[in-house]
């Protein structure tokens, strides 16, 4: 198990009764987490001094309740700076646990000894994009949401990476990869963090159980002859790690790599 223990601006303070108490920089948030099944006493003082509380609705969704919380603030991870702002579905614009992935591939990029081209699909607010760019890679950042790409650009500016070699694209990820195949473009590394369900900018429907394997197959056609890595992150509970391992091992066999 990898643990994101390099944070100074983020920590899980406590958890109980389906909720997590977290510190994001100078502010404390309470958010629901279905994996917190224990019913321990909420004795930590920060439970009573929270700055934001996301209440899940029985009908689905939910809403935020704020207490002296700014609309936006920043936290830092090593050389990177992220702009946070709570929005729908309990999100803040960052998944701190992803820092383990950032550290892993950043070391690979730095030690590659050659220029590395990275494709980041379903790239969200750009955590992986900025980590890869900071490590020295040129990055193509693709997400279907214009708002998320704008947010990622803001994070790049805040991180001092405004002029880094990053291409920002609002596009359907599958259609983009298909076009890259036709163009003959190749990448040394691919990162993807696909949602369980989503829609492209023109209403394209994405369901991970149906679409992830075909996408992996497509991506093998845009990998360079000596790829550095292929990283998939998924929070979909119905998609077991063993299934993803099988897909990657099957489709990437010709590259003679190791699947972890």
Task: Give the ranges of each region predicted by the language model.
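Conserved SAM-binding loop of SAM-dependent methyltransferases across substrates and taxa
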Residues: 125-137
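Conserved SAM-binding motif I beta-strand of class I
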Residues: 138-143
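Conserved alpha-helix/loop element of class I SAM-dependent methyltransferases that forms part
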Residues: 96-114
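Non-catalytic substrate-recognition/targeting regions of SAM-dependent transferases
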Residues: 5-22, 29-96, 103
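Switch II (G3) loop of P-loop NTPases
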Residues: 194-195
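S-adenosyl-L-methionine
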Residues: 144-191
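C-terminal substrate-binding/active-site "lid" region of AdoMet-derived donor-dependent transferases
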Residues: 38-39, 44, 203-260
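Conserved class I S-adenosyl-L-methionine
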Residues: 115-124
